[in-house]
């Protein structure tokens, strides 16, 4: 009734340029017709069976540099302090009320992750100030619309202070949502049958490789418990591993009925 392909990637974290993304590009060129994808992300917070991911928020990172004019703190009129300017900009960014969330997604949120003013002297106004921020956004926005909004603020404040700025953006993925259908409900039923838990449909958490796969087919995410992921002594339960194997087998059998 069909065929199955298994993709294992060794480049899933960070920029993820040499893994799933390149396979998806290859499949597009080959015009391979794929109907569905199940991604084995650790979707469950505490117990196997708690959660299926039906979408993910987008992720936009920005690295901002403000160029000022170095000088002595006793003579501020002879300098231009980029620290003051970057603080004003970051406050404006944090004050943005992007949205209130949707039925499927949490509200869009911006977090400042780095502030760097490379200045070892206490009595010198620095020449450069830098900051990094990240936005996790829902499907009310695109990375393009968010960049336009932020750039307006940057231009306005820089013009006011007669300063120069540089901003570098990196998009890890756009927000996406797989609308629940008969395949979703079948997977829910299989999980409940084996774990005795009916999984919640969720879009919480970070990005995943489904952000690439969604370009060629719909998909969901379901895997192990992620309680210890990215921690020292990361581990999973052997019982969970056996039950997940049963779940995957049942899903395949039901899908090809």
Q: What are these model-predicted stretches?
A:
Residues 1-55:
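Acidic/histidine-rich catalytic neighborhood of metal-dependent amide-processing enzymes
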Residues 42-47, 54, 60-257:
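Metal-dependent amide/peptide-bond hydrolase catalytic core
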């Amino acid at each position: 009734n069909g065929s199955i392909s298994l993709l294992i990637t060794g480049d899933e974290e960070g920029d993820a340029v040499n893994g799933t993304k390149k396979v998806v590009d290859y499949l597009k060129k080959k015009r391979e017709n794929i109907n569905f994808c199940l991604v084995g992300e650790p979707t469950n917070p505490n117990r196997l069976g708690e959660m299926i991911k039906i979408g993910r928020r987008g992720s936009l990172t920005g690295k901002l540099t403000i160029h000022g004019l170095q000088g002595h703190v006793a003579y501020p009129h002879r300098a231009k302090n980029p620290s003051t300017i970057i603080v004003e900009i970051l406050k404006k960014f944090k004050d943005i009320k992007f949205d209130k969330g949707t039925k499927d997604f949490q509200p869009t949120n911006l977090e400042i992750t780095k502030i760097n003013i490379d200045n070892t002297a206490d009595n010198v106004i620095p020449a450069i100030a830098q900051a990094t921020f990240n936005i996790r956004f829902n499907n009310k926005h695109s990375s393009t619309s968010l960049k336009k909004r932020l750039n307006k603020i940057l231009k306005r404040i820089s013009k006011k202070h007669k300063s120069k700025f540089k901003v570098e953006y990196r998009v890890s993925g756009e927000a996406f949502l797989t609308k629940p259908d008969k395949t979703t409900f079948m997977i829910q039923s299989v999980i409940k049958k084996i774990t005795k838990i009916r999984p919640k449909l969720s879009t919480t958490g970070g990005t995943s490789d489904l952000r690439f796969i969604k370009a060629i087919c719909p998909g969901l995410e379901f895997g192990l418990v992620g309680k210890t992921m990215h921690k020292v002594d990361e581990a999973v339960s052997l019982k969970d591993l056996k039950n997940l194997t049963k779940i995957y087998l049942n899903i395949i059998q039901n899908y090809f009925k």
